[in-house]
Amino acid sequence: MNIIMGILDQAVSAEEGYFAGGASRKSLMEEMRRIRSKYKATVFGDSGREGMKFKMALLFVLKRVKQKIILEDRLMEVIDSEVAYIIGCVKSITSEPIRVGTVEAVRPIQHEAEHKCAKPRTRANFPMDTSQLLRSWLKENMDNPYPSDAEKAYLCQKTGLGPAQINNWFINARRRILPFMKGKCSNFK
């Protein structure tokens, strides 16, 4: 039992050491390898109640470490992207010639610089399960693709979208998706 708790304690200590900033990712991996070899040598074959409890606790710790590392990687990607974007904005602003003028003349220049650095807005798609639910309703009601108010309320509740979003989705779907659905169904008949 003491060996089991020692291994679990080492895993938690390795996690804390890495995320507190005292250890590198490489040292975390080395420590996890040492823990794995110690685990295989002592506990791996233990399928008793205590062995199962330990395995579950170790799995919990390792999943938590994995999730934190994935989050850390995603954050680094976002930070790198933002740094590159800001560098681009700074280069864009500094590459323009300096204009000398009154305060009134400086304001349009500031607005122009802000406009050049403004991130383009990209439209976000609905989550896959939301689209899937709406598409399945459309497929079931292909002959009459106009949901009633009660059906719209049900779809709003299930998808979390507003009534206007549901209406717009069906307007677009009748133009873009429905012709292809009807074409596929007629091919199979």
UniProtKB/Swiss-Prot annotation:
Pfam families the record matches: Homeobox_KN
PROSITE patterns: HOMEOBOX_2
UniProt keyword list: DNA-binding, Homeobox, Nucleus
Cleavable signal peptide: none
Cystine pairings recorded for this chain: none
Domain of life: Eukaryota
Tagged with keyword DNA-binding: yes
Cellular localisation: Nucleus
DNA-binding span(s): 119-181
Major localization listed first in the record, in broad terms: nucleus
GO biological process: regulation of DNA-templated transcription
Classification via SUPFAM superfamilies: Homeodomain-like
Similarity field: Belongs to the TALE/KNOX homeobox family.
Protein name: Homeobox protein HD-2
Naturally occurring in which organism (per UniProt): Encephalitozoon cuniculi (strain GB-M1)
